[in-house]
Each structure stands twice: as structure tokens, then as C-alpha cells.
Curated annotation (Swiss-Prot):
This is Diaminopimelate epimerase. GO terms for molecular function: diaminopimelate epimerase activity. The record marks H168, E221 as: Could be important to modulate the pK values of the two catalytic cysteine residues. Belongs to the diaminopimelate epimerase family. Pathway: Amino-acid biosynthesis; L-lysine biosynthesis via DAP pathway; DL-2,6-diaminopimelate from LL-2,6-diaminopimelate: step 1/1. It holds the Pfam family DAP_epimerase. It comes from Ligilactobacillus salivarius (strain UCC118). Homodimer.
Length: 325
């Protein structure tokens, strides 16, 4: 079977189009395959953050995306991943703008101007947005948490919680705190499976404002750990940036978001009914085409596979190097 190794902002995945399989995978096999190929130590060619399964979508969409993390859990959405799936479906079906079915919503995606030569980009809708504790599976004694303390976590850092639709906990911090050990300490505790605040876990991001309209986001992703980038985290952080720092940025204005794996651009929108949604614009890089037997992938036998580089990764790295000059 063929898979694609892809990434958005360094957040890397394998794409597997289930329509191309000779034998359909059971639910158990979908999870096991993701766990085997994604393992950073024993997985396929260095592993990945997850597997993006592409399936036929329901009416009104041109495909469905399921996101299985490296630990076998399923994410409701993946902002970096959906851009790479958008590119795959765009090229497969010769479409420039269409909808992709995800767990909670059918999301608009469209081809965007490339970031540089051989660095194609896509624009993905990130929604729905909710601040309700029930949607976040959050227990802090409040219905919403916006720029407030959680004393059990820190007496010095204020947090905001938002689902987009996967849950995010966001804090605006200084550079020293951004790069320090607090993020790992707090996020590890909140994703240990038995804490009372987020019993199902949560994505945790620290955000530093670099200048008006430009932020840096560092994320500990639920089911993954520290990651180069998390698209929904960057979208959620952008939303909170607009809501909490309106003296610097506003709706319908482009925001540059830097992350350990690169950069994206975002824009926060507000519908007439008051609902928020975000545009997430960034690279959709295809690193390699992989061929491996279905049985070997499921069983974690990586002695016999082919790996054909596309050349796009070198172009992406050159683009990122130019950003940091």
C-alpha cells in the first residue's frame, strides 16, 4: 500500500487513503497501524505525530479526515493535518476549494498562494469554537475560563480555555516562561489521565507576543507531547490574542504565528450570530511517498519498504532558514 509522509509547520503525519486499500482496515487495525508507524524510536523512518486516514465523505464534502495520534487516541481535529489532506484531495480530484468532513464539522479548505518555490500552502477553516466547560470537559468550578488563574496549576500564570473543537488551554507569557519547564510540568500533569481538572487531557500552549500582529506559540499536544506545531493550538491562540489584546490586533487582520517548526498565518473572524472561526494558512509539504505491505505496517515490520523523497523538504527548510535571518 502507498502512504504519504507529510507535514504542516513540522507537525508530521502519514496520510493513508483508505479508498486505495485492497483490504479494508478494521478499527483495531487503524489504531494499531498508527501506533506502529508513528513510534519515534521503532516506527517507520523516524515515526510521526499521527496518521491521517482519508475516507469518502458524506454529501456536500469531497472527503473525510480521521486523525489517529501516535498513542492510538483519536483527535477531533488537526489544523496542520487538514492542510495536507486538503492538498492531497485537491490534487486527486483537481479541486481548488471544497469541504472536508471532520469529526464535528464540515470545514472549508482552499488552495493558497505558495509560501516559496516548492512550498505549497492551503487555507483551512478552524471551527466550531466553544468556551463552555462541558465542551472542554473542564472542571474548574466555572462555566468558562478566560484570562484567569487555576490555582492548582500556577499562582502566577493566567489561562484561557477554548475548544476549536478539540480542547486548548492557553497562557500568554514572557520569553523566559515560554522556554522554561513550566509548560512541560503543567501539561504532563493535565494529560496524566487521572487529574481532576481535565480528566480527558488537554492541549496546552504558552504564547509570547513578539510584536503587534506576531506571536510565538509553543504547544504540548494531547496524545503527542511537545510538537513542532499544532494548527488548532495556533488558531486558538490567535483567537485569544484578538480577544485579550485588542489594542494590538483585530478581527479580519492577518496574524503571523511562529512555532518551533516554522510559521503560519491566521485570521480570526466573527459571524453575524457572534460565533468565531479562524483561517489557518500554512504549508502542506509532501516529504516522501512510501510503499509498504499492509500487514508489515500493521505489525510494525519495517525491514522492507520503499521511501521516495519528493525534494519538497529541502525547499521548506530553505524557506524557514530565510525566515530566521
Amino acid at each position: 500500500m502507498e502512504m504519504l509522509k507529510v507535514h504542516g509547520s513540522g507537525n508530521d503525519f502519514f496520510i493513508l487513503d483508505e479508498d486505495n486499500l485492497e483490504e479494508p482496515l478494521t478499527e483495531e487495525e487503524l489504531i494499531q497501524l498508527a501506533q506502529k508507524v508513528c513510534d519515534r524510536d521503532t516506527g517507520l523512518h523516524g515515526g510521526a505525530d499521527g496518521v491521517l486516514y482519508v475516507q469518502a465523505g458524506h454529501e456536500g464534502t469531497d472527503g473525510r479526515m480521521r486523525v489517529i495520534n501516535a498513542d492510538g487516541s483519536e483527535a477531533s481535529m488537526c489544523g496542520n493535518g487538514i492542510r495536507t489532506v486538503a492538498r492531497y484531495l485537491s490534487e486527486k480530484k483537481n479541486l481548488a476549494e471544497f469541504k472536508i468532513q471532520t469529526m464535528h464539522a464540515d470545514l472549508e479548505v482552499k488552495k493558497a498562494d505558495k509560501l516559496a518555490e516548492k512550498v505549497p500552502a492551503f487555507d483551512a477553516e478552524i471551527s466550531p469554537v466553544s468556551f463552555d466547560a462541558q465542551d472542554l470537559l473542564m472542571h474548574v468550578g466555572k462555566e468558562k475560563l478566560i484570562d484567569d488563574y487555576i490555582p492548582e496549576l500556577s499562582k502566577a500564570i493566567k489561562f484561557s480555555a477554548v475548544a476549536v473543537p478539540n480542547p486548548h488551554l492557553i497562557a500568554f507569557v514572557d520569553h523566559e516562561t515560554l522556554m522554561g519547564e513550566e509548560l512541560g510540568r503543567i501539561a504532563s500533569y493535565l494529560n496524566n489521565g487521572n487529574n481532576p481538572i481535565f480528566p480527558d487531557g488537554v492541549n496546552v500552549s504558552f504564547v509570547e507576543i513578539l510584536e503587534p500582529g506576531k506571536i510565538f506559540v509553543r504547544t504540548f499536544e494531547r496524545g503527542v507531547g511537545f510538537t513542532n506545531a499544532c494548527g488548532t493550538a495556533m488558531s486558538a491562540s490567535s483567537l485569544m490574542y484578538v480577544l485579550l489584546h485588542s489594542d494590538q490586533i483585530d478581527f479580519e487582520k492577518l496574524i503571523t504565528v511562529i512555532n518551533p517548526g516554522g510559521m503560519v498565518r491566521t485570521m480570526v473572524h466573527k459571524r453575524e450570530n457572534g460565533d468565531y472561526w479562524m483561517s489557518l494558512i500554512g504549508n502542506a509539504t509532501e516529504v516522501a511517498k512510501v510503499n509498504i505491505s499492509q500487514a508489515d505496517a500493521i505489525n510494525g515490520n519495517f525491514d522492507n519498504f520503499t521511501w521516495n523523497e519528493t525534494g519538497e523538504q529541502a525547499a521548506y527548510e530553505a524557506f524557514i532558514a530565510q525566515l530566521h535571518r
